Amino acid sequence: HPSLKPGALNQYLSERWRKHLAEYGKFNCGIYADRGTYPRFSPATSRRDAWPPGGGLPGSDVAFLREQLLDAYNISYGVLEPLIGVNTSRNLDEAAALCSAANDWQAHDFVDQEPRLRASILVPQDDPEASIKEIEKRAGDWRFAQIQLGSKTSEPLGRRRYWPIFAAAQANDMSIGLHIGGTQNSAPSASGWPQFYIEDHHMLVHSMQNQAASLILEGVFEAFPNLKICLIEGGFAWVPSLGWRLDAHWAKMRDEVPQVKRPPSEYMRTNLWFATQPVDEPENPDDLRHVFEWIGWDRMVYSSDYPHWDFDDPHLAFRFQMTEQEKRMLFRDNALAVYTFRD
């Protein structure tokens, strides 16, 4: 996750938007203006050793990122996932300007400095027309590997208001990375607001389950059969049970959703991929292997979550034995199947 240095986007914004942000600030989708998050995160939600020795936030120093992550783990490609809130403004024109500036920032300040990195196309997802414009502007640029959306949305992503974004993704052969987070229009759970960080961290998975069900049951993958979506940082142990539950419901009530031509779990095996972070840690490590097998080894993509505090070390996160073929799929082949890597 790359971090913004103070004022880093200014050089990529027009004078109109620099003045606007200086005078009015960013109008995010929150309950209160400029409220602090609660439950509290750890500082920058990051590892203690990820703070660059030269100063700045974790993830803001390309040289230190190169040393601590890319070189340390022999990483060929690393996909940037900016969590900087530029696509969640209530002011859609502001969101479009900020997304475009953030895309320039990723390309120039990170990928141009370290060609093993690849950027994500940030889009103002509640403005499909502006999103399409940004996708078409960046899709041919080798520095961009995917389109990034957030899992907390104004409406479920399967709704047809979002379909133009999916059409543009498929037409440009770009995958979508659906990362946890997004708008904060309401409480993070159907039960209200949590009191503890441990609750809040667990609740992140719920938005992923909801979005997976929406995408499948609204018929997105029938309309866009070549669309590839990777669910990122929502965990994955829940995936088999969701598939089983949806299949059972579909068998009884399929006439309600005639747009769903196949059992829902089949779409999960053809159009969805799952990033591994955060890795679950059962007492018996082989239980996790069973989860991989239920989902399918070809669906799993390693993710580090660097520089966050729950970083998953590729050497330590998976405590069961893998064959060489399984390692290649998890750490290499599946990512090459999902993402657009061009040199």
Which ranges hold each PLM region?
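Helix-coil boundary/capping segments in enzymes
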Residues: 1-343
